[in-house]
Amino acid sequence: MSSDAKKEAKHKAAMEKQKESVDASIAAADEERGVGILLTGNGKGKTSSAFGMVMRALGYGHKVGVIQFIKGQQLSGEEIYLRDRCPDVAFYQMGTGFTWDTQDRSADMAAARATWEQALPMLKDPSFDLVVLDELTYMLSFDYLSEDEVIHALQHRPKEQSVVVTGRGGGTRLREIMDTVSEVKDVKHAYNAGIKARRGVDY
């Protein structure tokens, strides 16, 4: 057998083994319900990933709600797109700027509570297929919201509803109740090299 033929046979065997593993995992997954997803870590891409799922859900005609607990001074591309092109998406932002800009704990707690009150009805409404709670973890880390209340709401949402939570940290309890936890690692970031945030890429 030639060298190329051996490589081809080895590749085919590896792919067949991989397919068997994937098929077995698919066959074993027989429960039908919404999922809880936590996108955390210190790397870039958590919110971007969440909005990718928003686009995916909209492609299937699903009802989507998006709550952003931290809003910077700069308009984001996703905010512009959703408001201009996707009026059916229930979209709400806290609107006080980043908490490290305001430096007013009382005001931030009040804003977090008001924003959470916008999220709660979505988490109780079975007509919502997907709810994104962007940067919610900070509200827990800063103790702006009751962890017990947030955990209870996430655990008791409608069975078919999926929820995506983004942000660094969030605590052990949040990780434990989520079905999928992905940690985005900061390996290298343009900002650290002095490169400005790019419109359409970073915001």
What are these regions (language model features)?
Residues 1-36:
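Extreme N-terminal, non-catalytic leader segments
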Residues 19-22, 113-117, 163-166:
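Short gly/ser/thr-rich secondary-structure transition/capping motifs
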Residues 31, 83, 155-157:
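A generic structural signal for short, solvent-exposed coil/turn residues
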Residues 32-33, 60, 127, 159:
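Residue-level preference for short coil/turn positions at secondary-structure junctions
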Residues 35-124:
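Conserved P-loop
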Residues 69, 135-136:
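Generic detector of well-ordered alpha-helical packing
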